[in-house]
């Protein structure tokens, strides 16, 4: 007979280890001033985009908008001033570059206009008046010679009889030693070498004169 076998032995569990003590909590790390500020109430407001920082941003945006509007208004005002100055300057330049209006001739310090169509003396005077001028006032023989370089049609001038005397339309006195006047009429026109008076209703061309621009 075979000898009886012993039952296999079971492994014994290891003896229980001694209970390990729980680790002590680590001491809190001191915070830097920046971390403390970020974790404080103002830091939370900054991170949330409202409150203190939001109010500051809104004020900055408002100030920026106001500044832009002010600068825009200043720019518009400066532009308007430049436009006005350019207009005034252009008018001044016209006077400086052209001492007489278009279709007028310069002689000495006067501008002269020689009409082409015949009219009576009063119509010629009115035309000159509307152009800020008068029927020509002649002060010398040279001025008379200049006029006849541009007209041969014996035009009206600004001389008229008032009572027994002749007077220039601008108020200057007439000097009989400078010119002689022929004819019994009231209004005066010019011939190449003398002045002639005739009826004012007769039609003739006329000559206007005025001071040149300075």
UniProtKB/Swiss-Prot annotation:
PANTHER family: C-TYPE LECTIN DOMAIN FAMILY 2 MEMBER L. This is C-type lectin domain family 2 member L. Residues 10-31 have a biased composition (Pro residues). GO terms for cellular component: membrane. The keyword Disulfide bond applies. One of its GO terms (molecular function) is carbohydrate binding. The keyword Thylakoid does not apply. It comes from the Eukaryota. Its main location: membrane. Residues 107-209 form the C-type lectin domain. SMART domains: CLECT. InterPro entries: C-type_lectin-like (IPR001304), C-type_lectin-like/link_sf (IPR016186), CTDL_fold (IPR016187), NKR-like_CTLD (IPR033992). Residues 1-56 are annotated as: Disordered. PROSITE patterns: C_TYPE_LECTIN_1, C_TYPE_LECTIN_2. The chain crosses the membrane at residues 69-89. Keywords: Disulfide bond, Lectin, Membrane, Phosphoprotein, Transmembrane, Transmembrane helix. It is found in: Membrane. The modification Phosphoserine is found at residue 32. It is a single-pass membrane protein. Disulfide bonds join 128-208, 187-200.
